[in-house]
């Protein structure tokens, strides 16, 4: 089964048994690994660029659906230390609320603060509020 000469495969993807994206390899050969929360993968907890699933699994153990709201700190630290060639973004999320914290490949953390109604209230980057949301309710 030969591909048409004008057909160019962009990405190759693999999936976990629970249906979420496990790896994506671009045309340039760079592999990205995705890790998800343990509640059937509601939220991503890590995006690891320039690493293989085998490399990540050697550090995390079975990556299928094992993280509650984010990577355990020791696993995140090991990934960053043992995969210096990788660009790692981590995400912590609260069920039914949303993302609470992201840490980019440079180690810069962004916090997401929610109000008592679980609506996004502030985004804090490098200790400073960069975005504030105000909700004006009618008949409240």
What are these regions (language model features)?
Residues 1-26, 30-104, 109-140:
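Beta-strand elements of repeat-based all-beta scaffolds
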